[in-house]
Amino acid sequence: KETSAQKFERQHMDSTGSSSSSPTYCNQMMKRREMTQGYCKPVNTFVHEPLADVQAVCSQENVTCKNGNSNCYKSRSALHITDCRLKGNSKYPNCDYQTSQLQKQVIVACEGSPFVPVHFDASV
């Protein structure tokens, strides 16, 4: 079974991320990373930075998560990310996403030993 840390990597890490400038990036990646199985995941963020840099966020600024938990951490610097948002008229199985390239700070929830990201909470 996939661990929480592995799921985070599958859903949110794309360190090569060279093709994120393509308008079809989200449609391809959401399918490839298995987030359009059974339903279309409405919103998802991919981070185009080395995994080690994202894992390092777990030792940066401690902030409260959206759900009230206290194990979220905010990156010191802005990271290259791509936001994928399901278009309003899109229906499963034809999941159609809007692709937006951004540079923002990210907030991730971390847990475990080693202490690693397990949930993408927000970008700010």
UniProtKB/Swiss-Prot annotation:
Keyword Hydrolase: yes
InterPro entries the record matches: RNaseA (IPR001427), RNaseA-like_dom_sf (IPR036816), RNaseA_AS (IPR023411), RNaseA_domain (IPR023412)
Reactions catalysed according to its record: an [RNA] containing cytidine + H2O = an [RNA]-3'-cytidine-3'-phosphate + a 5'-hydroxy-ribonucleotide-3'-[RNA]; an [RNA] containing uridine + H2O = an [RNA]-3'-uridine-3'-phosphate + a 5'-hydroxy-ribonucleotide-3'-[RNA]
Gene Ontology molecular function: any one: nucleic acid binding
Span list, region Disordered: 1-25
Residues that bind substrate: K7, R10, K41, P42, V43, N44, T45, K66, R85
Any Pfam family: RnaseA
Tissue-specific expression: Pancreas.
Catalytic-site annotation from UniProt: H12 (proton acceptor), H119 (proton donor)
The keyword Hydrolase is assigned to this record: yes
Disulfide bonds: C26-C84, C40-C95, C58-C110, C65-C72
Task of the protein: Endonuclease that catalyzes the cleavage of RNA on the 3' side of pyrimidine nucleotides. Acts on single-stranded and double-stranded RNA.
Similarity comment: family membership: Belongs to the pancreatic ribonuclease family.
Protein name per its UniProtKB record: Ribonuclease pancreatic
Source organism per UniProt: Ondatra zibethicus (Muskrat)
Encoding gene (name): RNASE1
